[in-house]
């Protein structure tokens, strides 16, 4: 590199500038690439596509997309086939998440080039942009056209997956299954085949198509997944004892053990075997990443509540309240804390959590129940003003319940 710089100083050869910017670009030294192009321009050399390509790519990789586009506009004014420049402008808009801008320039790229690769790539990315713009009808129309023009393209797997996903999102399960099955047959990648077999298994399970759910679950290479999902299928058939055996086989599996333990905990909770149930829920919490951990912690609290160990129940529910930000169970937790503090005869704490629910969840189904709890609490502590507030609110949402307390509001 120093040698090249020296040569420039000696003879200012245009071709050396070109070589130098290409070397800087290869080394990911984007600032030097840009500075070298600026020197090239100051020396008055004429148009060089290689020089400006390097400059625009350097700006692009630095995330300076507007500057990158300005360079491509220079190239556009000099080039007969404008497809590549239009395509790169589209790419810059895409990376800015300006999908309307990207759409406009992918269209221009497709229409203004004889380069078959740029045409095909532009057509593909138009599909992806329409998908991001949520134009599902347009996506499917473009895919139909793309498949007619490029029947065996290297994009076919991606397109097939996209079609399947659109069908699935539209609740067209059978069409989605057909597309996922095509992708399963098409792909030679074991991970893709596994993912497709799993998705098809799950869709057939949702459809309660037991036979096909079993067939596709057996095509998955992961034994633990087979045990888990076939247990779900067995439950649909009412074969609960067989399902339990399957869950027990994978309680220590890193990927699916948390789900198996959660299902076992739920099973024994339903059987009122609270200690055994709690053991499985506690095991769920041992997994570093688990979608079931919050609900498992909640159910641990339920087991203690069922055993009338209200202090431990409160402790379990508080773990979620204090440690889980934006908990999806927040409304349930507030009710459980209110109820269990009530059973511990701590009326202040009970009131605190019922009040929080009352303030946050006025549209929820348990709002009337909580309002009544607050009314009873205020009657017990003889707080007349708040008593009237909750009575009047209860009168609006559950008049029959409110009338039981009319004698206190005189």
Regions found by a protein language model. Name each.
Residues 1-410:
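Acidic, polar-rich low-complexity tracts and alpha-helical solenoid repeat scaffolds
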């Amino acid at each position: 590199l120093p040698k090249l710089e020296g040569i420039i100083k000696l003879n200012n050869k245009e071709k050396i500038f070109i070589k130098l910017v290409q070397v800087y670009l290869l080394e990911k030294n984007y600032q030097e690439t840009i500075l070298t192009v600026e020197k090239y321009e100051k020396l008055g050399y004429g148009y060089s596509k290689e020089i400006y390509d390097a400059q625009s790519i350097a700006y692009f990789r630095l995330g300076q997309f507007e500057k990158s586009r300005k360079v491509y506009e220079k190239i556009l004014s000099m080039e007969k086939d404008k497809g590549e420049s239009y395509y790169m402008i589209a790419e810059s808009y895409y990376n800015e998440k300006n999908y309307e801008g990207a759409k406009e320039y992918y269209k221009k790229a497709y229409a203004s080039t004889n380069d078959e690769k740029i045409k095909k790539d532009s057509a593909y990315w138009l599909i992806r942009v329409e998908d991001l713009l949520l134009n599902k009808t347009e996506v499917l129309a473009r895919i139909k056209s793309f498949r007619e023009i490029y029947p065996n393209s290297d994009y076919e797997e991606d397109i097939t997956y996209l079609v399947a996903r659109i069908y699935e999102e539209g609740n067209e399960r059978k069409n989605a299954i057909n597309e996922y099955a095509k992708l399963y047959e098409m792909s030679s990648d074991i991970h893709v085949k596994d993912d497709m077999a799993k998705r098809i298994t799950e869709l057939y399970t949702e459809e309660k198509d037991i036979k096909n759910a079993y067939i596709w679950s057996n095509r998955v290479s992961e034994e633990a997944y087979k045990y888990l999902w076939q247990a779900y299928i067995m439950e649909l058939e009412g074969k609960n004892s067989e399902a339990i055996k399957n869950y027990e086989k994978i309680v220590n599996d890193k990927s699916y053990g948390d789900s198996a333990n959660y299902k076992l905990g739920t099973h024994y909770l339903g059987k009122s075997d609270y200690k055994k149930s709690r053991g499985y829920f506690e095991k769920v919490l041992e997994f570093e990443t688990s979608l079931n951990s919050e609900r498992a912690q909640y159910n641990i609290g339920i087991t203690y509540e069922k055993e009338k160990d209200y202090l431990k129940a409160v402790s379990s529910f508080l773990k979620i309240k204090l440690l889980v930000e934006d908990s999806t169970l927040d409304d349930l937790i507030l009710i459980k804390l209110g109820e269990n503090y009530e059973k511990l005869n701590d009326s202040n704490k009970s009131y605190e959590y019922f009040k929080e629910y009352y303030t946050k969840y006025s549209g929820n189904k348990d709002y009337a129940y909580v309002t009544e709890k607050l009314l009873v609490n205020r009657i017990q502590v003889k707080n007349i003003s708040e008593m009237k507030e909750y009575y009047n609110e209860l009168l609006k949402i559950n008049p029959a319940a409110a009338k039981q307390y009319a004698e206190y509001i005189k």
